[in-house]
């Protein structure tokens, strides 16, 4: 039978029962301990030694712990793995407390509420999101506890809510206790931690933060979010800004999968930031500027006036090189004001943080002067909005030591001269030893006792020791006996008692007074949080603008011209990231010419020729333009796109194994159902995931639907070359192709997009690039020559069947109709530009002809280079 729990373990269990889904870090002296299941799992995750509090087999309690000074490092590890950690502190001094020390949880750290962000995480937002369902959709609120940002919106359905969660990269979602099973399933699939909050707490704070909201549902979801924060953090949320409502319809919509396909923030190959548009554009000098750039990238604007305003500012900094250089030099000295303000309000700021805050504020007058020298209207309002907070900077300068320690409780934080009493304490501490030495010499002279000495012990404190042979020399009225030894007596004097009290109490009193003064300084700064946050927002915006100006100069970007008549004219456009990686190699620019009468470009050409790059570069150009950034082109005129849809597979050298025909159709359907005439659609080889006839029929039907019903600007790449005949049937479709040529029998990709369809597939050349055996390639050429001879006699004068009945597609929504046009259904005629023809050949050699048939039937144009290499490897093994 297990023995009864100790009082301490009973206390531990009571606290643990309140936080069953969190690791409980229970303070015991200089360590935070974990027990039972927390200890077993924590030891594994944190690589700690698992021990036992009781050595009894019948009552063994697993235990492990971490030093209190290193606790943040261990908490961060658990948070990064998606867990919660409850910090249980000692609320009383064990040295002065009789019985059990009172303990309670002072904060609950979760993936969505962590404040200690360093490294790459410092340049990213950490959003905690709340979801609350209502009739007709969801209300969604999110906050970054480290910066104080608080926003709220409304989405129409669960899919839109999940898309917004993924776009926000939220790691934790707060819901009411009862939610739909499908929502829980979606959160689980995406490794998003779900937390629950029932009762709304602190109505006054909730009311303050939601006072600008007119929608009751949005106020409710903000209340849910703020209540969770108050419950878990157990401290003031004074730095949270009043909730700002936004509408997704105010920004260009790009769903998460399209963002992934376009590599806006995450590289498809590495999963990292390098090689993305965000990586290319991020020439910001501050962490808050980097976070704002990511927000602008996530939400390109639709308001032309706001976009042009950003263009004007970029242009001014682009035109003033030296001012821009000076501005960059000052911005580098600005620390993360948003998160510094958050730590001030949160009560976690230290002396070094305040020095960083002061250093940042000292740069503001210099930045204002630089903007004043520009003397242009574009920066007038921004310059005037930059508040240097001289009162705050002055207070920190007077109060805080230039190089304070990290700890605020061990002394050394307050500057000398700030407080007279503190200076006295410090003087006593620093001069105590010298004063004792001087007193000893003074007493020797006064008494004539040369071996008189002053000593100290913990029992009696400071004392004057005199040998018994010299006792008679002491004046009776000044010396008070404290201790008698065998050969000596120890005494005290009024002066020694007075100094003893000052010296012994100086350290404790100094430390306590320093902390009291520091808290007063911190609270004084806290009162200016609103001003600090506004300054941070303005400096972040200025930082992003200078970054745009720098990349515009470095990469020869130009200011685009925006229009509302669907004119898309890009001269010498480039893919900015590909161009950067090519280094000294010359990137081949391409035009995108789609007037008001052209809505679809049908793109043909061999694999590896650059079709996907051409499509992506247009989308990136549109995103950059509506961010307020200049674009990679010689000249660019663009409409304002309301949405971008993509159906583009993974990069050509990836084999993800995730792209199924169903996913392809679902993504295509998303575009067809939601696109408008103001949207941009990129369809890359639609239909390749199924049989040839099915794929071709679907591809043609999709083209017709977009042409007749949607009217969006669309780039549609295909290997179904029969579809190029649609140019003669659909008024708003134009053929273009990515060229290639042969030089000395070698295939050369031109990477140049020109009008008209591709006239040759170069399939065998691509096979050669993939490393196929020379005998195989020779045989394939023989077969191809034979088949081309047969085709010459068999090819009809047209590649499209006579007209056949066409089922009218059901429109996704009522729009201004485009003239309805249908075309005959295409067939897989002998005129198709296949990689290898499919006609039978006479068998001459069993193994060779079997291999030739396999080569002939290989649909190389729909395969990646990796697919080809794997197949060639199998053939090589069979030939051995």
Curated annotation (Swiss-Prot):
Annotated segments matching region Disordered: 790-829
GO terms (BP aspect): mismatch repair
Amino acids binding ATP: 605-612
GO CC, alphabetical: cytosol
InterPro entries recorded: DNA_mismatch_repair_MutS, DNA_mismatch_repair_MutS-lik_N, DNA_mismatch_repair_MutS/MSH, DNA_mismatch_repair_MutS_C, DNA_mismatch_repair_MutS_clamp, DNA_mismatch_repair_MutS_core, DNA_mismatch_repair_MutS_N, DNA_mismatch_repair_MutS_sf
Keyword field contains DNA repair: yes
Biased composition range(s): Polar residues: 818-829
Domain of life: Bacteria
Entry keywords, A to Z: ATP-binding, DNA damage, DNA repair, DNA-binding, Nucleotide-binding
SMART domains: MUTSac, MUTSd
Pfam families (alphabetical): MutS_I, MutS_II, MutS_III, MutS_IV, MutS_V
Sample GO molecular function, one term: mismatched DNA binding
Chain's role: This protein is involved in the repair of mismatches in DNA. It is possible that it carries out the mismatch recognition step. This protein has a weak ATPase activity.
HAMAP family: MutS (MF_00096)
Record-stated family: Belongs to the DNA mismatch repair MutS family.
Name listed for the protein in its UniProt record: DNA mismatch repair protein MutS
Organism from which the protein derives: Limosilactobacillus fermentum (strain NBRC 3956 / LMG 18251)
């Amino acid at each position: 039978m297990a023995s009864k729990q100790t009082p301490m373990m009973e206390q531990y269990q009571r606290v643990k029962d309140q936080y069953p889904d969190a690791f409980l870090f229970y303070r015991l002296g200089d360590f935070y301990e974990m027990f039972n299941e927390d200890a077993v799992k924590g030891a594994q995750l944190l690589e700690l030694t698992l021990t036992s509090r009781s050595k009894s087999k019948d009552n063994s309690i697993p235990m492990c712990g971490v030093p209190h000074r290193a606790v943040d490092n261990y908490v961060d590890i658990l948070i990064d793995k998606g867990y919660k950690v409850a910090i249980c502190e000692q609320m009383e001094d064990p040295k002065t407390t009789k019985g059990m020390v009172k303990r309670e949880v002072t904060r609950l750290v979760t993936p969505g509420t962590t404040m200690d962000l360093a490294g790459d995480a410092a340049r990213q937002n950490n959003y905690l999101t709340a979801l609350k369902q209502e009739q007709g959709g969801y209300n969604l609120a999110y906050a970054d506890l480290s910066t104080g940002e608080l926003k709220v919106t409304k989405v129409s359905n669960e899919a839109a809510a999940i898309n917004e969660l993924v776009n926000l990269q939220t790691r934790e979602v707060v819901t009411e206790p009862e939610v739909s099973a499908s929502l829980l399933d979606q959160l689980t699939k995406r490794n998003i931690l779900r937390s629950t909050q029932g009762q709304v707490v602190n109505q006054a704070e909730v009311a303050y933060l939601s006072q600008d909201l007119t929608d009751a549902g949005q106020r409710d979801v903000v209340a849910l979010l703020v209540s969770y924060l108050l419950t878990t953090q157990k401290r003031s949320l004074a730095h949270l800004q009043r909730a700002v409502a936004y509408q997704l319809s105010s920004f260009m919509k790009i769903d998460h999968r399209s963002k992934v396909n376009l590599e806006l923030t995450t590289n498809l190959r590495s999963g990292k930031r390098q090689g993305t548009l965000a990586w290319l554009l991020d020439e910001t000098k501050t962490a808050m500027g980097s976070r704002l750039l990511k927000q602008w990238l996530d939400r390109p604007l639709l308001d032309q006036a706001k976009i042009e305003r950003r263009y004007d500012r970029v242009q001014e900094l682009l035109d003033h090189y030296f001012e821009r250089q000076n501005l960059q030099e000052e911005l580098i000295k600005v620390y993360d004001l948003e998160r510094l303000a958050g730590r001030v309000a949160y009560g976690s700021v230290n002396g070094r943080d305040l020095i960083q805050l002061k250093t940042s504020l000292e740069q503001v007058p210099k930045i204002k002067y630089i903007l004043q020298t520009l003397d242009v209207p574009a920066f007038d309002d921004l310059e005037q909005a930059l508040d240097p907070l001289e009162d705050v900077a002055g207070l920190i300068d007077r109060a805080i030591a230039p190089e304070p320690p990290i700890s605020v409780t061990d002394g050394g934080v307050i500057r000398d001269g700030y407080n007279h009493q503190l200076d006295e304490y410090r003087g006593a501490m620093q001069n105590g030893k010298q004063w004792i030495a001087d007193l000893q010499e003074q007493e020797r002279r006064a008494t004539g006792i040369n071996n008189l000495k002053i000593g100290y012990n913990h029992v009696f404190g400071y004392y004057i020791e005199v040998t018994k042979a010299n006792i008679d020399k002491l004046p009776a009225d000044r010396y008070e006996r404290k201790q008698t030894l065998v050969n000596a007596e120890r005494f005290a004097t009024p002066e020694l008692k007075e100094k003893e009290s000052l010296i012994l109490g100086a350290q404790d009193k100094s430390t306590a007074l320093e902390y009291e003064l520091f808290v007063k300084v911190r609270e004084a700064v806290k009162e200016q949080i609103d001003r600090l946050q506004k300054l941070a927002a303005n400096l972040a915006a200025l930082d992003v603008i200078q970054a745009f100006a720098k990349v515009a100069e470095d990469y020869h970007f130009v200011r685009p011209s925006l229009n509302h008549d669907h004119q898309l004219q890009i001269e010498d456009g480039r893919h900015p990231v590909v161009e950067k990686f090519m280094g000294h190699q010359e990137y081949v620019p391409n035009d995108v010419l789609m007037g008001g009468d052209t809505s679809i470009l049908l793109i043909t050409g061999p694999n590896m020729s650059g079709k996907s790059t051409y499509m992506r570069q247009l989308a990136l150009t549109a995103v950059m333009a509506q961010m307020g950034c200049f674009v990679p082109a010689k000249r660019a005129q663009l409409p304002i796109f309301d949405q971008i849809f993509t159906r583009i597979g993974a990069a050509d050298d990836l084999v993800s194994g995730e792209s199924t025909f169903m996913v392809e159709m679902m993504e295509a359907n998303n575009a067809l159902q939601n696109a408008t005439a103001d949207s941009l659609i990129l369809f890359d080889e639609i239909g390749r995931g199924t049989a040839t006839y099915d794929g071709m029929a679907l591809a043609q039907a999709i083209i017709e639907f977009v042409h007749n019903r949607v009217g969006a600007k669309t780039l549609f790449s295909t290997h179904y070359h029969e579809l190029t005949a649609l140019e003669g049937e659909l008024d708003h479709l134009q053929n273009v192709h990515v060229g290639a040529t042969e030089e000395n029998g070698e295939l050369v990709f031109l990477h140049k997009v020109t009008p008209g369809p591709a006239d040759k597939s170069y399939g065998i050349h691509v096979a050669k690039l993939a490393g196929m055996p020379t005998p195989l390639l020779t045989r394939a050429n023989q077969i191809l020559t034979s088949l081309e001879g047969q085709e010459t006699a068999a090819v009809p004068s047209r590649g499209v069947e006579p007209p056949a009945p066409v089922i009218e597609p059901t429109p996704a929504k009522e729009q201004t109709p485009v003239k309805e046009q249908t075309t005959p259904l295409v067939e897989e005629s002998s005129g198709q530009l296949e990689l290898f023809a499919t006609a039978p050949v006479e068998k001459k050699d069993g193994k060779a002809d079997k291999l030739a048939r396999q080569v002939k039937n290989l649909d190389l144009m729909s395969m990646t280079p990796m697919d080809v290499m794997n197949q060639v490897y199998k053939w090589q093994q069979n030939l051995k």
